């Protein structure tokens, strides 16, 4: 009797601690409660919804009977029609590059976006979580949260925790499955061999060796630490979420109206950053992509998705043109030719309407032709479908999937997902080809004159940079969502075992850039700081016009110059729009539950959480003996955009401005200025700019895995060669290098 009483009391206490969500609580929800709801909806998305209150909301919500709860009834009608035909089933892999799936997920987004209030939004999301494809649900909810007014301030879990299959190798996830099946009971020697360690709190750490020779196909794999970086891929994914290629301008606020120029500069900067990393590893520039030549370097993702489908490998010397994709290749050539001809002519005609491509602002039109499509409102026509999504068509030609317009089921390639596209070296070859179209447009614009570059009365007197040192460290990523829960764990809404993957990543020591600027007046200005290579991989100096597009924008900020000498100190961690390590979702949820005011947490710990570029990757790796590079600083007058008051605008308010370079967008000068146009060397150099040579040193650790347990080279296995792998590796299991003759003759056996 006593035990029963204790059970009843504890059950009542549990209910008091976690109040159920109903219609009444939905109406009165504050930002903290809304945050918790979104976190729960995105937890273990490949499994049934384990939070009973949210499950009941979804089951009891009848979409067809609540047309008055959506601001656009035609959206609801389209959704109901599609549902009758059938959506992508649960368990199948979702990709935006299949026309039918794209239409379905955009309709889902519209349902969430046009919900009249947050109550309807949550109910619709709960219903979708129960009945629609999990990949589509995550995508539609993520985009809706980033664009709805009543969701501002809500933090999304990192995509690598929501769906770890896109960020963790299949062999690592397989080891987690093994641990789950064995309930953590593994032989100690096997744990050593697999690189598994258990902590005192049932947390299992599994090592993912980025230099495992079994995943190497060619020298391009030396860059896996960069291309597979989870924060870099998260940055690219979140950019797409904020600026989807399919989204019309009417969904964007006026601060985002340079969206396609911003899209171009994002791709160009990622490409430039990739080139710096190539030079840091003694590799040359990116090769040109040709449809009619083989891709010499392959890529092996080593990734398996939750339904068992493997992302296909592309081996070396891959032939692009094949029987099944000849039409797609022809489509790519035709689209590209039309756009190139339009740039050369200076205009394009669509449905009888002429669009100019001659002025600086026309880059938005060009961006729509390349990265998106022309809206109907641009032409006042009923059908505008020409030159759409050139980038998607090219990805379809390069990927190992099939370009479908009417089928559900595809095996997606690594290029088909925004969470994984940066991993493949061919992605950068493709982007180079795409960006060359924009460069052609820029070449037709005049070079900047001395008046464009000069800032009268302002001079950069001195630039001092601290010693620049990079190194590799470790990061523990939570991949528990990749492992299925037991029935008891679902009831408890919590996994008994926590699985972490240990990743090796590039980092740098903190540094400062100190600027001494002389001014004869008090004036608002924009300071831009760039970093670029000095020499190529053959140690040859690079011409500035060949090199200008390889400069990465380190920092850009507004500043109020005072009369006289101005000393500006910029810390590497405080440079514009950078993000530090993201908080693990389980820790974030505990923190949200324990605090009373979310605003303080957002300002201190969550700044640039979605839009920030990883601060760790600010610098390329460099060389052990030092890699010489050029730092470029330019100070220009602020040419403020219209309808903005600089005196009342706080550019750090990320709830108001969610773009990736908000400081630059306040200035009328083109993004990438002054390196975006061909440089007239005779008129380029002015007192308000300065080139400074800097050196980046790479610190090679004795064992780069700082938090590694006692031994990794397996001393108990005689078959292992215990020699150290040279170059950039660390002590690892060298199973494939062991001194065993593998050329066994089967007849002898």
From Swiss-Prot:
Keyword Repeat: no
Superkingdom of this protein's organism: Eukaryota
GO molecular function, one term: nutrient reservoir activity
UniProt note on tissues of expression: Fat body, and hemolymph of larvae.
InterPro entries in UniProt: Di-copper_centre_dom_sf, Hemocyanin/hexamerin, Hemocyanin/hexamerin_mid_dom, Hemocyanin_C, Hemocyanin_C_sf, Hemocyanin_N, Hemocyanin_N_sf, Ig_E-set
Disulfide bonds: none
Signal sequence extent: 1-14
Keyword Transmembrane: no
Keywords: Signal, Storage protein
SUPFAM superfamilies the UniProt entry points to: Di-copper centre-containing domain, E set domains, Hemocyanin, N-terminal domain
Induction: Suppressed by juvenile hormone.
Similarity comment text for this entry: Belongs to the hemocyanin family.
Protein name listed in UniProt: Basic juvenile hormone-suppressible protein 2
Origin organism lineage: Eukaryota, Metazoa, Ecdysozoa, Arthropoda, Hexapoda
Gene responsible for this protein: BJSP-2
